[in-house]
Design a protein with these regions (language model features):
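Noncatalytic, beta-rich nucleic-acid-contacting surfaces in large DNA/RNA-processing enzymes
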Residues: 1-448
C-alpha cells in the first residue's frame, strides 16, 4: 500500500503491476541497497534515530552504537557481538570504543593485527580464532575448528577434560607459531589473549546476517521515513506497552500522532504532510475490516447525517454497525464532521454517545417507518438532552484504553512538557533498561 501511494504521489496516476514491480526493484530489493551508504549510517546509528531499528531497541545498545559509530556491516556485527553480558562485563565495549578513537589494541604482531584489523584489533568473532589458528599457529584447516571448540569449552566451564584439551592445544599452537617464525614468548602471549577473548567470541555469519537486517531497517528509515514509521506502528498494534514506547520514540523524531478520524484514517497507518501520523481503523477494538471497507468506500462525510443516512432518507449503514460507531465516538474520532462542541448538534462526545448509541434502535425504527423521520428523532433527542456533561479525564482515559489498549501520553502530560523532556534527553522509565541507571519520568496511575 505504501508503494502504491508513493508512486501515485509522484506520477499522479494509479500504478499498474509493472510500475510497482519496477519501483520495488529500484528502491527496496536487496540488490538495490548499498551497504556502504554512509548516509544511512550517519542518519540512524550516529544521530540516534532508533524507531523500529532492529538490534537497537534498548537504551544501552543505542548508546553503544552512538559511541561506536559504525560505518560498515562488519562494524554493526561487531557492535552487536560485543553488546552481550559477557563482553560488557569484561569492558570489551570500552576497549572497542577506545580502539575506534585511535587507541588500537596491539597484539605485538603485524600479522595478527592484520587479521583483526576490521574489528580494531579485538578478537570478536569465532571465525577470527580459526584464522589465527591457521595463519599463526600453523594448524591445518581441518584442525582449526578443533582448537576453537577446545578453547570455547574451556571458557564456558567444560570441566577438567576441557582444560586439559585446551592446554594440549596450547602446546600445539605455540609449536606451530614458532615454526612460522614467532618466538615462544610471543606465541604464548597470542594464545593467552585468544583465551581471554574466546569467552566472548561470537559467530560472525550469524552476527552479519543480523547486521544486514538492522541495516535494511536503517535504510528504510533514511529514505522512506514516513512509510517506515507507519509500518513500525502497525507492527506494535497488538502490544499496548510496545506501542506506547513506539509513540515515545516517534515523537522524539518530531512526529505528531493524530487522533483517529472517520475521514482521514485508513486500513493502515497513514502519513500526512507536516510529520503527522494518523492511526489505522484496524488498530481499534470494535472496528472490523468489513466496516472499514464500507467507511472508506462511502467517504468523504461532510456531517453526521450524511454518514448515517442516504440522500433519500434511508439508513445508509450495514457493515459499519453500532459497535464500530460506538468505538469511534468513545475515542472522539468524528472531529472532521464538525458536529461536537458549543452551538453544535452535540455538546460533547458523551452527549453524542447517549443520543446515537443510547437511542440507536429507536432512531433506526423511525427511519424504517418513514424516511427522514430518523433524522428528526435524533435531532429531537439531542436537543432535549443538551445539559449532558462530558466525560471527566479519568473516564476518557478508560474509554481510550478499552478501545486501543493504551492511552496517548498527551492525555496525561501536555505536548509542550513532553517536548521539553525530549529536548533534555529525559526518557520515560519504560525506555530505561532494568540493568541501567538513568533519570526518567513516570506517571502515578493510582494511589491506594
Amino acid at each position: 500500500m505504501a508503494i502504491v501511494t508513493n508512486i501515485q504521489n509522484k506520477s499522479k496516476k494509479t500504478p499498474q503491476f509493472n510500475d510497482i514491480k519496477n519501483w520495488y526493484n529500484q528502491n527496496l530489493a536487496p540488490d538495490a541497497v548499498d551497504f556502504f551508504d554512509q548516509r544511512v549510517y550517519e542518519n540512524v546509528y550516529h544521530k540516534g534515530k532508533w524507531a523500529g531499528i532492529f538490534q537497537c531497541t534498548g537504551r544501552g545498545s543505542q548508546n553503544f552504537f552512538m559511541r561506536g559509530k559504525p560505518r560498515s556491516i562488519v562494524d554493526i556485527a561487531t557492535l552487536t557481538s560485543i553488546y552481550r553480558p559477557g563482553p560488557l562485563a569484561a569492558k570489551v565495549d570500552d576497549l572497542y570504543v577506545d580502539a575506534r578513537n585511535g587507541k588500537q589494541f596491539d597484539w605485538g604482531d603485524q600479522r595478527v593485527n592484520k587479521i583483526l584489523e576490521k574489528t580494531n584489533g579485538l578478537l570478536i568473532f569465532q571465525e577470527q580464532m580459526l584464522q589465527l589458528a591457521h595463519e599463526v599457529g600453523g594448524f591445518p584447516l581441518d584442525e582449526c575448528d578443533k582448537l576453537r571448540k577446545a578453547i570455547m569449552k574451556r571458557t564456558i566451564g567444560g570441566g577438567e577434560e576441557a582444560i586439559k584439551k585446551a592446554a594440549s592445544m596450547r602446546d600445539g599452537f605455540v609449536t606451530g607459531a614458532m615454526a612460522n617464525g614467532y618466538d615462544k614468548k610471543t606465541a604464548e602471549g597470542i594464545y593467552d589473549k585468544m583465551l581471554y577473548f574466546s569467552g566472548y567470541a561470537f559467530n560472525k555469519s550469524h552476527a552479519v546476517a543480523y547486521a544486514m537486517d538492522s541495516f535494511f531497517c536503517a535504510y528504510l528509515m533514511t529514505y522512506h521515513e514516513d512509510e517506515w514509521m507507519c509500518s513500525y506502528l502497525k507492527s506494535m498494534s497488538s502490544n499496548p506497552i510496545n506501542r506506547a514506547k513506539a509513540f515515545s520514540e516517534i515523537r522524539g523524531l518530531g512526529y505528531k500522532i493524530q487522533n483517529l478520524d472517520i475521514n482521514y484514517s485508513n486500513k493502515e497507518w497513514t502519513a500526512l504532510p507536516g510529520k503527522k501520523l494518523v492511526p489505522s481503523f484496524l488498530s481499534f477494538k470494535g472496528i472490523g475490516e468489513t466496516a472499514v471497507d464500507e467507511i472508506i468506500s462511502s467517504r468523504p462525510y461532510t456531517d453526521l447525517e450524511s454518514m448515517l443516512w442516504n440522500p433519500d432518507g434511508s439508513w445508509r449503514l450495514s457493515k459499519f454497525n453500532k459497535r464500530a460507531l460506538e468505538s469511534l465516538i468513545l475515542v472522539e474520532g468524528l472531529e472532521s464532521l464538525n458536529c461536537v462542541g458549543e452551538n453544535k448538534l452535540f455538546k460533547n462526545y458523551r452527549h453524542m454517545h447517549n443520543v446515537i448509541i443510547g437511542a440507536w434502535n429507536d432512531i433506526k425504527k423511525s427511519t424504517k417507518r418513514n424516511p427522514f423521520q430518523g433524522r428528526d428523532a435524533m435531532r429531537a433527542i439531542a436537543l432535549a438532552t443538551l445539559d449532558c456533561d462530558d466525560w471527566v479525564k479519568e473516564e476518557k482515559l478508560k474509554n481510550v484504553v478499552d478501545i486501543v489498549g493504551s492511552a496517548d501520553i498527551t492525555m496525561l502530560i501536555p505536548q509542550k512538557i513532553l517536548d521539553k523532556l525530549i529536548e533534555k534527553g529525559v526518557s520515560s522509565i519504560d525506555d530505561i533498561e532494568e540493568d541501567q541507571s538513568d533519570v526518567g519520568w513516570y506517571c502515578i496511575k493510582d494511589i491506594q
